[in-house]
């Protein structure tokens, strides 16, 4: 339960519409973080046509860095797309999150600097993410890894991009993701009074991320209203969800996006995919960017590591049986 005092504070902070410049300046304050984690990092790039897509690699150990840039390594990798409503945030702002992710999972983390709306509307941010994923899966980055050891992960708008990249990869057939992790993903297309989801109505005004702000984000991301019907814009619009990766979805109890993420998980499962969905009790949208001392973050990494380790074990058993 949330105290009355905390609820009053949250309500006071949950007001207004999205103003792009001020929202970006506020997000950039994260770069002043005095508790930043210093890991071995490497900046590289992928290409979406003629456009360079910067990526930053985070290595949990010296050994991982040496192995990661040696051809043929099987060190596991998380390909990460950051949140921010497709409008704010950056690789630099998510530096601590990605460093902690590398430490907590013992994975190399590859964070993608996709272009932002409204300067670059749908599908440009998605195509940047897809290009980075394709480069990683086909060993066109400086990092060489086993595609079976890659997991795509994203939070909020990054969860949307993760789901959309996996749909696009299935449809285009250029590479095959085996796992995706969606952290409070934005997979719907409506946050008005017409929304079918209870969480939009219950949590859409008092818990930092509001329904009004979500509508603003969608309006800034879309080219026209028609985009909202596109499954690559709103994965919940996809009617055929077969043949998608093993999926872990984490939602937050006090998040307007909670129900749509859980519904997406159920639809994936009905379509025959292996899916785990966990609701983090007492959590708000955005909690994953908090420090590791927060219990909600610790709980999330227990689910993430359990999902990753179980998937690797199943795949190893399958690979062993296929060689007999």
How should each PLM-predicted stretch be described?
Residues 1-45:
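An N-terminal hydrophobic leader/cap segment in hydrolases
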């Amino acid at each position: 339960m949330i105290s009355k005092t905390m609820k009053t504070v949250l309500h006071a902070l949950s007001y207004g519409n999205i103003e792009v410049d001020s929202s970006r300046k506020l997000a950039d304050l994260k770069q002043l973080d005095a508790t930043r984690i210093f890991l071995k990092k490497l900046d590289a790039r992928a290409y979406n046509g003629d456009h360079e897509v910067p990526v930053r690699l985070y290595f949990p150990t010296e050994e991982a860095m040496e192995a990661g840039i040696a051809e043929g390594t099987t060190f596991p990798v998380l390909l990460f797309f950051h949140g921010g409503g497709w409008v704010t945030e950056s690789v630099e702002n998510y530096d601590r999150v990605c460093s902690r992710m590398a430490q907590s999972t013992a994975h190399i983390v590859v964070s993608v600097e996709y272009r932002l709306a409204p300067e670059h509307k749908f599908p440009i941010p998605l195509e940047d993410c897809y290009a980075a994923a394709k480069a990683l899966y086909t060993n066109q980055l400086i990092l060489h890894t086993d595609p079976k050891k890659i997991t795509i992960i994203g939070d909020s708008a990054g969860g949307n991009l993760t789901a959309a990249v996996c749909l696009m990869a299935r449809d285009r057939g250029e590479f095959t993701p085996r796992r995706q992790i969606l952290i409070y993903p934005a997979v719907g297309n409506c946050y008005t009074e017409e929304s079918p989801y209870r969480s939009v109505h219950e949590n859409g005004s008092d818990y930092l991320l509001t329904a009004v702000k979500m509508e603003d984000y969608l309006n800034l991301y879309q080219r026209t209203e028609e985009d909202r019907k596109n499954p690559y814009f709103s994965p919940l619009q996809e009617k055929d969800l077969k043949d998608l990766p093993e999926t872990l979805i984490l939602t937050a109890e006090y998040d307007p996006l909670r129900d749509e993420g859980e519904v997406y998980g159920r639809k994936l499962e009905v379509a025959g995919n292996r899916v785990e969905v966990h609701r983090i009790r007492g959590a708000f949208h955005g909690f994953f960017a908090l420090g590791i001392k927060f219990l909600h973050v610790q709980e999330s990494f227990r689910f993430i590591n359990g999902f990753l380790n179980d998937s690797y074990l199943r795949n190893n058993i399958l690979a062993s049986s296929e060689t007999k």
